[in-house]
Amino acid sequence: MEPILALLLALGPFQLSRGQSFQVNPPEPEVAVAMGTSLQINCSMSCDKDIARVHWHGLDTNLGNVQTLPGSRVLSVRGMLSDTGTRVCVGSCGSRSFQHSVKILVYAFPDQLEVTPEFLVPGRDQVVSCTAHNIWPAGPDSLSFALLRGEQSLEGAQALETEQEEEMQETEGTPLFQVTQRWLLPSLGTPALPALYCQVTMQLPKLVLTHRRKIPVLQSQTSPEPPSTTSAKPYILTSSHTTKAVSTGLSSVALPSTPLSSEGPCYPEIHQNPEADWELLCEASCGSGVTVHWTLAPGDLAAYHKREAGAQAWLSVLPLGPIPEGWFQCRMDPGGQVTSLYVTGQVIPNPSSMVALWIGSLVLGLLALAFLAYCLWKRYRPGPLPDSSSCTLL
């Protein structure tokens, strides 16, 4: 009987007697408020004959946040973490008093998810991390992580220990946290899924909030043949904002020259110039009036040699030397579509050093041949037997 009575008191006005009522709006016993937002809780009391008196009590109740109206008091919650706690409204008619408590929970759950790595590569074991920033509350009772394959949890993923760290805040007294969940992934098969998703859920009284972040998976564009030392397997990485390509060895294979997508906006394409030792060509076959230019390269674009001519732009390493590992990006205007290429670090042979090495080897060979001829001449020339101790090394 007591639980039913408590539920009735929480859900509606309290019918005390003829001409009397005690009401709290919103009537829920627990209220969740987003940090930085405001909420007003109205507590009212009506009496038939006596004067109605209403008061708010609770943890650090600031009278400046209570607005007094005839027969009611309005409590304003400012959405600060200090507002978290229980507030009690007390109403009285003459000698009779009644009360209703409200538990206020201020939460912070911005859409600030960070996932690493930026993309997944099929065929290898990997660790995926998902970090939610500026979170409160951060306990496991209210915050949970999931690694999804579509709408289902990814089978075989091993969840590692969750890490929690306090965020640096400009305003003191605001203990927000960053929470990181890591998973050890099994080797993704081929063909792989287009993407995995990190999903973070905050569950509060009568409120469930969810944020999700996409982790693209590199898709092989070549036929499933065994890899060799003379060919590399290019990958295409697609996302909702940009189209990116990645290759594990540009020195032995040209990038695919077919359009990355046959639908939607036209994107520029990146190729390796086979006529140069190492040169990238970005071009756009998107009609007249378009231009392309390089916008990103490992290190600094100033360290590369650039040539741009309308819908074509070339980029090469100058001077010859090791190629930094990282992303190369080309942009097309108008439209702003970009294409990115990931290149692993490699060393380009220097022609001058190759010539010097060849000449040095030739000179050493000639010296060795001359030494051998000298020793044979001393051993087999007519006359007394010579001392051949100097040629024993042969």
Curated annotation (Swiss-Prot):
Query: Any idea which UniProt keywords this protein has?
Result: Cell adhesion, Disulfide bond, Glycoprotein, Immunoglobulin domain, Membrane, Repeat, Signal, Transmembrane, Transmembrane helix
Q: Look up and give the membrane topology term.
A: Single-pass type I membrane protein
One GO BP on record is: receptor clustering
Q: Which residues are glycosylated?
A: N42
What sequence ranges are listed for the domain Ig-like?
20-107, 108-225, 256-345
Principal place where this protein is found? membrane
Tissues expressing the protein:
Detected in Peyer patches and mesenteric lymph nodes but not in spleen.
Q: Which ranges does the record mark as transmembrane?
A: 354-374
| Domain of life assignment | Eukaryota
Q: Cellular location of this protein?
A: Membrane
- Answer whether the UniProt record assigns the keyword Aminoacyl-tRNA synthetase to this protein: no
UniProt-recorded name of the protein: Mucosal addressin cell adhesion molecule 1
Species in which this protein is naturally found: Rattus norvegicus (Rat)
Q: Which gene encodes it?
A: Madcam1
